[in-house]
Swiss-Prot record:
Compartment annotation: Nucleus; Chromosome
Residues covered by region (Essential for interaction with Cp190): 220-232
Region ranges (Stabilizes interaction with Cp190): 95-165
Biased composition (Basic residues): 668-683
Record protein name field: Zinc finger protein pita
Known function: Insulator DNA-binding protein. Chromatin insulators are regulatory elements that establish independent domains of transcriptional activity within eukaryotic genomes. Insulators are proposed to structure the chromatin fiber into independent domains of differing transcriptional potential by promoting the formation of distinct chromatin loops to form topologically associating domains (TADs). Recruits Cp190 and cooperatively binds to chromatin promoter and insulator regions to exert transcriptional regulator and chromatin insulator functions.
Length: 683
């Protein structure tokens, strides 16, 4: 059985079939860029954004896509970008007062390949010059999404010469007007319309002008249903694709349009419909129907969807933005005040959120850590460690009767006792555990989700959720094959230097760089500033078209201008945090989940769903609970003061180092501490 499975998996990988419609014609690789197709983003990213399906080389699936699906993905992606752009402009209107101008809609995809023919055959008529031109122009104006294959316009050789009053006899002619298109050449609707109009002009030159009065009777359309099919617009729920449309006339001059509708668009019987008889299979990707996100477990998706029905009841007094919780609103207020209350103890760099500070502190790998004697948690500064130690020294008279935890307040004990209850409102579907809040359940579900299912193909990072990967992939495409868009006028360029040359025009006019929004002192400094963009590394924003000179400038821009966009990534699966320090711990774990590699699965906190203000567990138990350590491993008597805690930490660290490397190896640790003190005193 295992051998058959391996054989089938190998056949699936090598099968030359379109991964999305299962056709075997006109295939191309998903992972190789087609130079004839101008795209707004690479194809795997478009597929992820539209279908929530991640494709990458070596994923065990067919690696091909047909031409029609390729164009449809490009069209859908452009449409999605247009919708998001419209949403942004509409939300900016209350703040700016500038009503946005209409956006340009993406053109419908059109493919033309040379295999079949479109025949326009005029029969006997008194006006051989008028009918072909009218028919072609009508088709050029009305056809919206017709797959035309190798167009030929033929004049019948059986035209009978007739003499019309005031004109010369029409000679007998036998000409063929043929327009061939190379295989797999992509043409837009404008190209097709122009092509048909040119063909009509050629026909007009071949025939002399005939007075209008010579044709009092207009030809009758015999099959109006075919006309309706040709003219069917994009608003139709299911638009049939047409192959080989033919325009014919009978002996009386009446017009008939004969079309062949592709079999895949005809109504199917239930027994022939693959979707009716398809067996449902389990999948590890559960896309949200209300947004572009997807999740590895169905229950995570259900928790996420709760936020689509929640109301934003906390409104900012300085602008019109609203938030789910007081904590979100407090974070947003930093944008207006400019306050950055969380400072690094090593380099004094300031941040608006403690989670960003914790992420930054991990970069100081060469600085000795101060270890808490109670829980062995490391800190970069003695002050932080002493403040943390005070929490362990609190009197906690309220002890749980089931476990060893104790609490400083009775309310904390009552909240904790719900943990031991077997009738909690949020049960896990994969085990017998249940939880008091949806956020705690979501964090527990990470253990069931297994490994991170979405690895990046360009670097070593991997992600638990598809939209985390999608957001990360934009950082690669901004510096590779993606088009570069001017933030001022939205003109796009395929080359970064071309964009900079264009941006120089805007910067000269306004003395403000359109790339990084920096105000330039004078016109003489404009060119030198743009040269810095050419020579320095590019730090592209994931949410807009700005590109900055340094990572610091980019981070400041995101914190100031994209607070709303960052909310879905910062707040999912998070408790309200209105209690004493509860949010800080969760934010720190969230950063580990999204940015760190090779971390134990139990330490992950899944991506935020928005603050869990729906539920009442506002305090984290770790803030006021304390579990006495086992007597063999830790000291049961707490130190009398914080200074004694520091001395014990130093002594214990020195003993550890001595045991591992020798008696004299403990000295460098204290030497680093002295260097750290000198650095602080110098500052």
């Amino acid at each position: 059985m295992a051998a058959k499975l391996e054989v089938r998996e190998a056949m699936l990988t090598e099968k030359r079939v379109c991964r999305f419609c299962l056709t075997e014609q006109k295939l191309a690789s998903i992972f190789e860029e087609n130079p004839r197709v101008k795209t707004t983003a690479n194809l795997p990213l478009q597929i992820m954004a539209i279908t929530a399906i991640e494709v990458y080389a070596g994923d065990g699936m067919p690696g091909h896509i047909c031409l029609e699906c390729r164009l449809l993905f490009e069209h859908c992606y452009r449409f999605k970008q247009m919708c998001k752009r419209a949403e942004t402009l509409l939300r900016q209107y209350p703040l700016t007062g500038n009503w946005p101008s209409p956006l340009e809609k993406p053109r419908a995809p059109m493919t033309m390949v040379a295999s079949k023919k479109l025949l326009v055959v005029p029969a006997k008529t008194a006006e051989p010059s008028e009918t072909p031109k009218k028919l072609l122009n009508t088709m050029a104006k009305s056809s919206s999404q017709v797959i035309i294959e190798d167009v030929q316009v033929l004049e019948s050789a059986m035209v009978t010469p007739r003499t019309v009053a005031g004109s010369s006899p029409v000679p007998r002619r036998s000409h063929a007007y043929e327009l061939k298109v190379d295989n797999n050449q992509e043409l837009s609707m404008d190209d097709v319309q122009s092509m048909l109009e040119d063909m009509a002009s050629e026909l007009e030159k071949e025939f002399p002008d005939i007075p209008q009065k010579a044709s009092p009777v207009k030809p009758k359309v015999l099959n109006k249903s075919s006309i309706r099919i040709l003219n069917k617009g994009p608003a139709a729920p299911v638009e049939p694709r047409l192959a080989t449309p033919k325009v014919k006339r009978d002996d009386s001059g009446n017009v008939a349009i004969v079309t062949e509708v592709l079999d895949s668009d005809l109504p199917l019987d239930d027994q022939d419909d693959p979707t009716k008889n398809a067996e449902k299979v389990a999948t590890d990707v559960f896309p949200c129907p209300d947004c572009e996100r997807s999740f590895p477990l169905q229950q995570l998706l259900e928790i996420h969807r709760l936020n689509h029905t929640r109301s934003r009841s906390f409104q900012c007094l300085l602008c019109e933005k609203s938030f789910f919780s007081k904590y979100d609103l407090a974070k947003h207020n930093f944008v207006h005040t400019g306050e950055r209350p969380f400072k690094c103890a090593i380099c004094s760099k300031a941040f608006t959120r403690k989670a960003l500070l914790h992420r930054h502190e991990r970069t100081h790998t060469d600085v000795p850590k101060f270890i808490c004697v109670y829980c062995e948690k490391p800190f970069l500064s003695r002050q932080e460690m002493e403040k943390h130690a005070e929490r362990h020294q609190k009197k906690r008279p309220f002890q749980c009767g089931v476990c060893t935890k104790s609490f400083a307040f009775k309310q904390g004990l009552e909240r904790h006792e719900t943990v031991h209850s077997t009738n909690l409102p949020f049960p896990c579907q994969h085990c017998e555990r249940s939880f008091s809040t949806a956020s705690k359940l979501a964090r527990h579900l990470v253990a069931h989700a297994g490994k991170r299912a979405y690895p990046c193909k360009y670097c070593h990072k991997s992600y638990m959720l598809s939209h985390h990967l999608s957001r990360h992939l934009r950082t690669h495409t901004q510096t590779s094959d993606a088009s570069f868009v001017c933030s001022e006028c939205k003109v796009s360029y395929s080359n970064y230097n071309d964009l900079l040359d264009h941006a120089l025009i805007h910067a000269t006019a306004s003395l403000k760089c359109p790339m990084c929004r920096k105000q330039i002192e004078d016109i003489d400094s404009v060119e030198s500033h743009m040269d810095q963009h050419k020579q320095s590394e590019r730090h592209a924003c994931e949410f807009c078209d700005h590109i900055f000179l340094t990572q610091k400038c980019l981070q400041r821009h995101i914190e100031d201008d994209h607070v709303v966009e960052m909310e879905p990534y910062q707040n999912e699966f998070e408790d309200d945090g209105e209690g004493e320090g509860g949010v800080d711990e969760k934010e720190e774990h969230l950063d580990d989940f999204e940015d760190m590699d090779n971390v134990k699965q139990e330490e992950f906190v899944t991506e935020y769903l928005e603050d869990d203000a729906l539920y009442e567990d506002h305090l984290d138990d770790s803030d006021e609970s304390f579990t006495p350590p086992p007597p063999k491993q830790r000291k049961t008597n707490p130190p009398k003061d914080a200074q004694q805690s520091v001395r014990q930490t130093r002594s214990r660290d020195a003993q550890r180092i001595t045991q591992k490397t020798g008696k004299n190896e403990g000295k460098p640790h204290h030497k680093l501490e002295r260097n750290l003190k000198n650095r602080r005193s110098a500052k």
